[in-house]
Amino acid sequence: MFNRNLTLDQVDPDVWAAIQKEDVRQEQHIELIASENYASPAVMQAQGTQLTNKYAEGYPGKRYYGGCEYVDVVEQLAIDRLKQIFGAEAANVQPNSGSQANQGVYMAVLKPGDTVLGMSLAEGGHLTHGASVNASGKLYNFVPYGLDADEVLDYAQVERLTKEHKPKLIVAGASAYALHIDFERMARIAHDNGALFMVDIAHYAGLVAGGAYPNPVPHADFVTSTTHKSLRGPRGGVIMMKAEFEKAVNSAIFPGIQGGPLMHVIAAKAVAFKEALSPEFQDYAQQVVKNAKVLADTLVKRGLRIVSGRTESHVMLVDLRPKGITGKEAEAVLGQAHITVNKNAIPNDPEKPFVTSGIRLGTPAMTTRGFKEAEAELTANLIADVLDNPRDEANIAAVRARVNELTARLPVYGN
């Protein structure tokens, strides 16, 4: 039998040591990677329970294994809470990731070779929206759409391509697009031309839940998402759909592309969804956007160019070409200053994907630790200070000291 009193540091000190160092890094650094956030202790506790031991192929009330009466309760709570947050008719909480959620929708309604419209990866889309290196781009005939001359989503192009190519499905959503997406307009284009409409809100889900970004659920046939990022849950995925597609989507997830669901993760999803229904989460989502706008505005005042000129969400792309520094270099020097960002291609980027001409910044994690407008403005100025003198080690050290003071004052996991 197992001894309940044995702790990880006793069983595996090597893994424990690495975890402790990562804990220190997360506490000391300002996290600005737009896809990252901090899960609550309750979410992490749920994910570390005995539910990890339970196989539960199937769905609540219709399992292929016995002993599922309690995990059925957990999964149904997750489903019901997700539907309540977004006003969805039906939901599946079993996808292990956002990519698998997207794959599940594709498998439910498409055949290999079917035509699909998706946002170009080069202009802000996601790998699973038809990138040639991704399974979606290999299995289906994806036609990319992008931005207009003002770096705004080109709805006229979407309509033109829809009429020309007659896709079976149009996919909206992005991994690096700062503005609101007009989901109602996109849905009208799709449905007026006989196409289904899917929205991937992996990046925006927490903002939608908090009323800080438009909700696509009333307009879309399918809405997919991750459960981490701005939603602040465990790493995983979900699908919401019109009731008429529930059976097809459920069959596509299991037995189509997955076997037994990760019940410990679904428990953590249920906890995160309860948190997202709270008034405090509404305030959080609004603050994420406020912080992002201050961050972007301050960077512009410091001479940096923001793609699309502004942000209306949690995320922004910074074009570094006027600074004469690549995204790869900026990521490295900002990391030395304890500011964590990711290099990111800008629209029509001349640099290679591992180099890039830009960085992507996001405010979900900084907001979770209690940053407000004043801290967002300070963070932007610290970023600009580093990028003004990226090879000055004394300058980087001075910024790092100020970052450490700020993060010590506002810890992620306080007492």
From Swiss-Prot:
One of its GO terms (cellular component) is cytosol. The record marks 228 as: Plays an important role in substrate specificity. Keywords: Amino-acid biosynthesis, Cytoplasm, One-carbon metabolism, Pyridoxal phosphate, Transferase. (6S)-5,6,7,8-tetrahydrofolate binds at residues 121, 125-127. Its cofactor is pyridoxal 5'-phosphate. The modification N6-(pyridoxal phosphate)lysine is found at residue 229. One of its GO terms (molecular function) is glycine hydroxymethyltransferase activity. Its main location: cytoplasm. Its EC number is 2.1.2.1. It catalyses: (6R)-5,10-methylene-5,6,7,8-tetrahydrofolate + glycine + H2O = (6S)-5,6,7,8-tetrahydrofolate + L-serine. CDD domains: SHMT. Coiled coil: none annotated. Gene3D superfamilies: Aspartate Aminotransferase, domain 1, Type I PLP-dependent aspartate aminotransferase-like (Major domain). Pfam families: SHMT. Pathway: One-carbon metabolism; tetrahydrofolate interconversion; Amino-acid biosynthesis; glycine biosynthesis; glycine from L-serine: step 1/1. InterPro entries: PyrdxlP-dep_Trfase, PyrdxlP-dep_Trfase_major, PyrdxlP-dep_Trfase_small, Ser_HO-MeTrfase, Ser_HO-MeTrfase-like, Ser_HO-MeTrfase_PLP_BS, SHMT-like_dom. One of its GO terms (biological process) is tetrahydrofolate interconversion. It is found in: Cytoplasm. Belongs to the SHMT family. Catalyzes the reversible interconversion of serine and glycine with tetrahydrofolate (THF) serving as the one-carbon carrier. This reaction serves as the major source of one-carbon groups required for the biosynthesis of purines, thymidylate, methionine, and other important biomolecules. Also exhibits THF-independent aldolase activity toward beta-hydroxyamino acids, producing glycine and aldehydes, via a retro-aldol mechanism. Homodimer. This is Serine hydroxymethyltransferase. It comes from Bordetella pertussis (strain Tohama I / ATCC BAA-589 / NCTC 13251). The gene is glyA.
